[in-house]
């Protein structure tokens, strides 16, 4: 019996052919994907549509879309490097580092402390590692910052300033002043009343003056206290014709306050017209005013740890915390309590307010002894030196006295000034007590104080001859 093969309908054969073609096309696409699995990063895959693609996306998730909307987090190093574009603090190297302010309290000049900033970053183990800072300029010294600055001659190194300004635009006028000094015809002399003794080189200034400050350098200084730079000198030991005829050695190591006073330029019109910094007197205010310096006149402060310090306090200056140790001059409080009853006590210092004001808040928190406080911003800057022009007080100068260990500080009112020996640590010092009888007598006389001060201390006799 012969079996006959049944032929399929044309429609069924057409459907089978279509299925076969689809399978071939599918396999060929898979082969192409295996042969070239990598695609260009900028080409996006074709997005499928329809119910089937929706189910696939729901199960697998749209990774490409998530990658575009939520890119991978950057590392901390990458973020810090980008932040260098907006930060105001320059960083060293490519590796981010956290600067840490450190205070070093070892010193080399006259036993006084120094402070400087060390750029460091934290290791992974938590220890500090020094990094040399090549982009940041070195921090300026404390010389002329927190404490009273050092006074300078009108030396060639300081030609760029003029009265009231230390800008480089006035160099010509400063040169003329230097020429007028005629240094070759002046004898080298030891400083009197305020600067007698050996010279002490300072950091960044040609001389060490009596202008109060000691620890203002940022270099290491030897661990010993400053010996007094002042000694009482009789007015008769002033200048003579023999001194003027002798040769002066231009070593710039000895600072004479009276030579400075002799050649100080006059006040400018702007400085003469400054508004008074103090309020008007009240009925309870004493008639006479007594202006007192701070550093080396009433106290001695240091960044070195002082075993005999009467008090200590921190000072924040230029983002660095400094620990200040304070010695009080003998009879400091007794002098203030006695003088505050008959004088309007005014503190006038060339130190920074951030330091001096905090110290006075500790010593006299209720302002019972010192009625007013003036700081460096109230001084007149002359050739880079700060001078205390008493006109800024707004007080009658015939009834105003200033006591300062630096006579050059009251260069513009020499007849109002009483020099006092600089004090550092002498526990037997009685200079404040010695002034009490004279000051009380001035109030009792109720006269112009200037002739009495001039006759008593004769500072004009210490000025060099013309």
Curated annotation (Swiss-Prot):
What's the domain of life for this entry? Eukaryota
Question: What Enzyme Commission number does this protein have?
Answer: 3.1.3.-
All copies of the FCP1 homology domain together span: 283-442
Q: Which segments carry the region annotation Disordered?
A: 1-111, 189-238
Signal sequence interval, chain numbering: none
Top EC class, one word: hydrolase
- Keyword Cytoplasm among record annotations: no
Note whether Iron-sulfur occurs among the keywords: no
Segments of skewed composition (Basic and acidic residues): 63-82
What keywords is this UniProt entry annotated with?
Hydrolase, Protein phosphatase
From the UniProt record, which GO molecular function terms apply?
A: phosphoprotein phosphatase activity
The record's listing under Gene3D superfamilies reads: HAD superfamily/HAD-like
Pfam families assigned to the protein according to its UniProt record, in alphabetical order: NIF (PF03031)
InterPro entries linked: Dullard_phosphatase, FCP1_dom, HAD-like_sf, HAD_sf, TIM50
Residue stretches of biased makeup (Polar residues):
50-62, 189-199
What protein family is recorded?
Belongs to the CTDSPL2 family.
Which purpose does this protein serve, as stated in its record? Probable phosphatase.
Stated name of the protein: CTD small phosphatase-like protein 2-A
Organism encoding this protein: Xenopus laevis (African clawed frog)
Its taxonomic placement starts with: Eukaryota, Metazoa, Chordata, Craniata, Vertebrata
